[in-house]
Structures are given as structure tokens and as C-alpha cells.
């Protein structure tokens, strides 16, 4: 990961996996390394990005904001799919991805498999166009396993009170990821 060669080739990275498996942690680590190497880097949650793009459009500043996010060599967009993206937001998001396509590197974290992105974006054709541009020059990394956040919780409760955490263990042997 130290070389960040993917940025020289304007490749993208998609981290796909359930909540708590380390997608954001890995994306953040890449972003920090990018900053250390002097690479322009921005991290933003998808919902915040969509809100900023929509607000800018209402204020007549969408071009300015799209240009701003298009210029970063590494743009990390966290948590695509946690909240639905309505038509206006989806169109603005597409414009941003189109501007970055084959010019800059975008890192995406999502808990939604690409086949379900049509449910996240209000327009399935637009979702396909976005996904097509993101995965064309991308390393797609699927991370499996159990949530790091739940690993320290007890798996057995003698009094049967509280949530059932029997599906979680303190050791996670199912993790897998690809070396960048």
C-alpha cells in the first residue's frame, strides 16, 4: 500500500463488506498515506457529499463544488448505500464520477453489493452508469467476516437479557482482503 501505485494509474478501489469489517479503516489508512506522500486527498461520507452537491445546486454553485471534488487525486467516498440517493443527488453524483473517470482515483466503501446499487440510486440506469465508471479501472476488494465493533461483547449471557450476540466471537478468522 505504501507506493499507492493505483493513483498513478488513476485506478479506483471499491471496498465491499458488511458493517464493521474495516472498510472505512482501510480507506482512511490509504488516505493518510496519500497525505503523507503529498497526494491531494479528501474523505467524505456519501450522504454529506450528496447534501453538499444538492445545496450547491440550489445556490447556483454546483459547477464550483463539482470542480472542487473532481480535483483531488484521491477522493474517498464512505458509506454508499446506507441511505437512498434521490434523483437530483444521483445525477450530481454521476457528474462527479464522470469528471473523475480515468483522471483521478476514487475509493468507495459500501455494504451494498454492486448488483443492488439500483436500489440505492433512484434510477437504475444511472446506477449502472456510475458503477460502470467506478469498476472499469478498479480493484474490487470484498471483505468478509464479523464486525470488529462487536468482537469484545460477550457471546453468552446467562440471564438471557440483552441482545443476542451469539453470532459474534472475540476471534475473527473469516477476514479476507486483497493486498493493495
Give residue ranges: language-model regions.
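Conserved P-loop
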Residues: 1-71, 120
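Walker B motif beta-strand of ABC-family P-loop ATPases
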Residues: 74
